[in-house]
């Protein structure tokens, strides 16, 4: 038996038959025995043969299958029982060839059958303890805890499912309530706005300034003045040219002049109608006076007077008695003539009106 070492310092066993004596022997070879057998070795510098014997590790620290996967250890199966008994007794149990050998051969290697059985049982028990400890360490809980955990999870899942089924109904109820509340608020706001707008039509809002009285008489006077000012604004819009006037006195004078000019135009038109049909005698003064009285009784503005309304009321047969060969003048023509007369100032001269005869013709000059 001889020992050999490679460059990395790895050691192995080698056997051979001596040609001279026919004795089988076991030697150390450079084949790495732990490269494939034991994946738990952290580095390649550690020698399992030397360190295992020096540290005094027992067979219970190593799995029996470590040597079973190593093809280099299967060569011990054909050894004779008496040839290597001394070497096998001193060799650690982790390097024994359990893979290809039976129970009787292992006993022959170790010197007795009882010793081999004890080693095998010790290895199996240590392997089972190791796996049990590792499982407990990974789980970190007792079997009772493992059983209670699924029950708690199942209860929590049931509660979650029930809440999820109830949530859509609650959400729908809440959305309907919000919609109803919004509608009720909108209706209340509309009613309040309508109730606020209705009283504004019935009264005039007056703000009391500093130095002004707030009793009922003074407030009534202020309301009356406010109404007068509104009517003045209406007249100002009807009369042309009054928008540029600021003073009330000047504006009233302009309105009076405009009304007088309208009266003169009405007189002129009535005379013109008399010339068309001489048989009709029209008392213009009486008609105008009656129309003015009616307008005052109805509290209608004077500017809204229709000059032809009195003619139709007092002379209902005017259209029947007129000569059919003369067509009635259209309203647009009458308006254009009135404007021309107003611009020319023809009506403003009273001597011109006196030159007309009662029947509408000019008087001969003497």
Curated annotation (Swiss-Prot):
Sequence segments annotated as region (Disordered): 1-20, 123-201
Molecular function (GO) terms listed? DNA-binding transcription factor activity; protein dimerization activity; transcription cis-regulatory region binding
Taxonomically, the superkingdom here is Eukaryota
What CDD domains does the entry give?
A: bHLH_AtBPE_like
From the UniProt record, list the coiled-coil ranges. Answer: none
Report keywords, A-Z. DNA-binding, Growth regulation, Nucleus, Transcription, Transcription regulation
Query: GO cellular component annotations, sorted alphabetically?
Result: nucleus
Name the Gene Ontology biological process terms. Answer: regulation of DNA-templated transcription; response to blue light
Q: Where is the composition biased (Gly residues)?
A: 1-11
> Where is this protein primarily located?
nucleus
Residue spans with biased composition (Basic and acidic residues)? 123-134, 159-170
- Compartments it resides in: Nucleus
SMART domains from the xrefs?
Answer: HLH
| Expression sites (tissue/organ) | Expressed constitutively in roots, leaves, stems, and flowers.
Further details from the record: Plants over-expressing BHLH74 show increased hypocotyl and cotyledon lengths.
Can you state the subunit structure given in the record? Homodimer. Interacts with IBH1. Binds reversibly to CRY2 after blue light illumination.
Task: Give the matching PANTHER family.
Answer: STEROL REGULATORY ELEMENT-BINDING PROTEIN, TRANSCRIPTION FACTOR BHLH74
UniProt-recorded name of the protein:
Transcription factor bHLH74
